Amino acid sequence: MDVTIQHPWFKRALGPFYPSRLLDQFFGEGLFEYDLLPFLSSTISPYYRQSLFRTVLDSGISEVRSDRDKFVIFLDVKHFSPEDLTVKVLEDFVEIHGKHSERQDDHGYISREFHRRYRLPPSVDQAALSCSLSADGMLTFSGPKVASGLDAGPSERAIPVSREEKPSSAPSS
């Protein structure tokens, strides 16, 4: 059986026939009644509409900025501590991996893991890369851009994640 995967912006009123929030990255967060019976929300109240952007904004989408002077990655990792995160540079890629062991929360036991990989622009100074985690759970990976004649340095190295006590200055999408 073929199942069409729809982007959340294009959800239709035929909710039971399309994927719901259950398949999104909301692991460990509570379920709503429309997650289990999505057709109820439109039949009980014709004025109720689920936010079209909620699943997109809350799904851990990263933001990558590359301007003339620097390269920056913002990634929401609010469920992870610096000890749970590993940031490595492998040649011209940065790999961010987060994993925490099973722990108890309000809804039972939960464990989380993610892996993201981004290509670094060739003009990024790999010797000056830094990574920090803000108090509100925003991981910021950044590096300055320089003249393109630099040696890339070692083919693999770890970038330590430092903790900041202030909230992130990254714009909320």
Curated annotation (Swiss-Prot):
Keyword hit for DNA-binding: no
Example of a GO cellular component annotation carried by this entry: nucleus
Domain sHSP: 52-162
Glycosylated residue positions: S162
Post-translational modification: Acetylation at Lys-70 may increase chaperone activity.
Region Required for complex formation with BFSP1 and BFSP2, residue ranges: 1-63
Main localization (coarse): cytoplasm
Post-translational modification Deamidated glutamine, affected residues: Q6, Q50
Binding sites annotated in the UniProt record for Zn(2+) 1: H100, E102
Function noted in UniProt: Contributes to the transparency and refractive index of the lens. Acts as a chaperone, preventing aggregation of various proteins under a wide range of stress conditions. Required for the correct formation of lens intermediate filaments as part of a complex composed of BFSP1, BFSP2 and CRYAA.
Name of the molecule in the record: Alpha-crystallin A chain
